[in-house]
Design a protein with these regions (language model features):
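Amphipathic, Lys/Arg- and hydrophobic-enriched alpha-helical face
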Residues: 22-40, 57, 118, 167-170
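Sigma70-family region 2
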Residues: 11, 48-66, 85-86
Length: 176
């Protein structure tokens, strides 16, 4: 099915077109949902919420950019709005002490273990870490997305890195 035709049918609330859109893109958007969620159940809920938003806003898509990129942006925004609404993002005080980086020492950890550790981070740290490290957003962009200051974004990132570093060190100690 041609993309323009698919979008037109989705705007008209054609269920078969919506189902086709879901089958075609769900696996890609699910990966994004996993990055921002604590577990698979929450990721699935976020995926469904994202598709509901996509179906509602699909008529607003302008063919100026990538349709897939537009859907990814909708997905991230839907998840962030959910966390803001549920008050997952309690701001840290602005005078939060910045964390000092430990001397760099490479630590080996499997990708699955690292992803598990990222999912275990408190929401505000996980969201900031994902947006900055995995998605390449600046602290200014993150602060706009999350409704915080750039200082809070930097503090949350530093704290996320510290927590991850400690989890990796503890794993290494437990294995030895």
């Amino acid at each position: 099915m041609i993309l323009e035709e698919l979008i037109k049918k989705c705007v008209e609330r054609d269920r078969s077109a919506q189902e086709y859109l879901y089958r075609k893109y769900a696996h890609k958007l699910y990966g994004i949902c996993l990055k921002y969620s604590r577990n698979k159940t929450e990721a699935e809920d976020n995926l469904h919420d994202s598709f509901m938003t996509i179906y509602d806003k699909i008529g607003q898509f302008k063919s100026l950019g990538s349709f897939e990129g537009w859907m990814k942006r909708i997905t991230v925004n839907t998840i962030l709005q959910k966390y803001r609404k549920e008050e997952y993002l309690a701001q840290l005080p602005e005078q939060y002490q910045s964390m000092h980086e430990d001397a760099y020492q490479p630590l080996e950890v499997s990708l699955n273990t690292l992803l598990q550790y990222i999912q275990e981070l408190p929401n505000k740290y996980r969201l900031t870490f994902n947006l900055y490290v995995l998605d390449g957003y600046s602290h200014k962009e993150i602060s706009e997305q999350l409704g915080t200051s750039t200082g809070t974004s930097k503090s949350n990132l530093a704290r996320a890195r510290t927590i991850l570093r400690e989890k990796i060190k503890n794993q290494k100690i437990n294995i030895a």
